[in-house]
Amino acid sequence: MTRQSTYSRDQLLASARGELFAPDSGRLPNDPMLMFDRITEISNTGGAHGKGVIRAELDIRPDLWFFGCHFIGDPVMPGCLGLDAMWQLTGFFLTWIGAPGRGRALGCGEVKFTGQVLPSARLVRYEIDVSRVINRKLVMAQTDARMLVDGREIYTAKDLRVGMFTSTENF
């Protein structure tokens, strides 16, 4: 498939099934772990560091699966799901640029949560800025990210790292 600058939910789910890029390339998780509905922008130029950018959105609905279990009587989106979305998008970027293998989160430098996503929210927006891409024996991207709910920044992460592995047997 030709590289695009935007992707719909159906296309993202095709990635989860191995149908968007090469069958042996990296994949996004399937529902319900896919944590965004669309990619509104992806580029290997631009962003805060000039090395690439990914922008994505998640429509918030009160019936999303995590609100029913986290927490009963006090529903809130788990912070780890927003962080995972940032890793998912970083891995998607590596697959999008043609990096071989399967993506795995390798860590991050710093994470801050300064707000929460409640069922009354409407839209989560992810803004990912690529700071480094290594494409040698080790294939890895490093990014900085922000998550906004209804336009307000609530999560930041620095130095998110995702690597691509042609074999995950010894990982």
UniProtKB/Swiss-Prot annotation:
Residues at the active site: H70
Gene3D superfamilies assigned: Hotdog Thioesterase
The UniProt record lists the keyword RNA-binding: no
GO MF terms, alphabetically ordered: (3R)-hydroxyacyl-[acyl-carrier-protein] dehydratase activity; trans-2-decenoyl-acyl-carrier-protein isomerase activity
Family: Belongs to the thioester dehydratase family. FabA subfamily.
Subunit relationships: Homodimer.
Name listed for the protein in its UniProt record: 3-hydroxydecanoyl-[acyl-carrier-protein] dehydratase
Naturally occurring in which organism (per UniProt): Xanthomonas axonopodis pv. citri (strain 306)
